[in-house]
A protein has these predicted regions:
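An N-terminal alpha-helical hairpin/helix-loop-helix interaction module that forms a charged
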Residues: 1-142, 160-255
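Short hydrophobic alpha-helical segments that form membrane-spanning helices or hydrophobic packing faces
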Residues: 150-157
């Protein structure tokens, strides 16, 4: 019996009572507020993420030529963004055959677009772990600690215009993503949500995105490779909303 993949509803997530308590109910207004606060001097960890971001994107920009040792170092580099220690490939040596397959897959996903993604998925919008695409991505998950979060970050740094990062903060808004199939469903829903935002007011969205990108470049030394993609901007807002939800719950438990 074929399992139906999970469906993620971003709009419903933003309408949850715990979200509405901390937002204005208008995504573009919330976007301007949350992105504006990220460069606050008190947000040291957040600022550290923003500072290091373009360097990691640049590291993976020529992934088709990445060597075995640089792939391993790159995955450890990404885990510098995470609270958990990395157990690379379950502590087992990565075979040359698996490395070649991984490099080929990473080189391929660097070119993915929404059109390619839709063609790759089945009619139900799911990936199949038994197919060629699924096997390669399950191997990718394996080398990133068996973690969907780690895998999503690697995919994002490979192709920041298409793959959104997923973590526990975003889960607080849209729900949990536990499998490769569910991550694919999350990506598909993310792009549907993005279209709705842009259809609502693409000019205002672009103004806010560009203002934040320019502010980051000014703050961190006018880095020419400091690009905040549409995907990255929306993901950052969801991250900040989710983080605020988690922080408010902690405060409620320990007033």
């Amino acid at each position: 019996m074929k399992m139906m993949c999970k469906v993620y509803d971003f709009e419903a997530g933003l309408l949850k009572a715990e979200v509405r308590k901390i937002t204005k109910g208008d995504f573009l207004q919330d976007m301007e507020d949350y992105l504006g606060k990220m460069l606050d001097g008190r947000q040291r960890l957040t600022r550290s993420y923003l500072l290091s971001y373009p360097f990691i994107v640049k590291y993976f920009s020529e992934v088709e030529n990445i060597t075995f040792d640089k792939l391993i170092l790159g995955v450890y580099l990404i885990y510098g963004w995470m609270p958990r220690a990395l157990c690379f490939n379950e502590g087992k040596p990565l075979s040359q055959e698996d490395f070649v397959e991984l490099r080929a897959k990473l080189s391929e996903v660097q070119k993915w677009s929404e059109k390619h993604f839709d063609e790759m998925l089945g009619k139900d919008g799911c990936a199949s772990e038994k197919g060629k695409e699924g096997k390669s991505l399950f191997l990718l998950k394996k080398v990133t600690n068996g973690s969907i979060v780690g895998m999503s970050k690697l995919l994002h740094f490979i192709n920041p215009k298409f793959f959104p990062i997923y973590d526990s903060n975003i889960a607080a808004v849209v729900g949990e993503v536990k499998t490769v199939d569910e991550y694919f469903a999350y990506v598909k829903a993310f792009h549907c949500f993005t279209k709705e935002i842009l259809n609502h007011d693409s000019e205002e969205f672009e103004r806010i995105r560009k203002d934040f990108e320019d502010a980051c470049r000014k703050e961190f030394g006018n880095q020419t490779n400091m690009e905040v993609t549409t995907v990255r901007a929306i993901e950052l807002v969801l991250f900040q909303i989710g983080k605020s939800i988690k922080d408010s719950k902690k405060t409620a438990k320990n007033p």
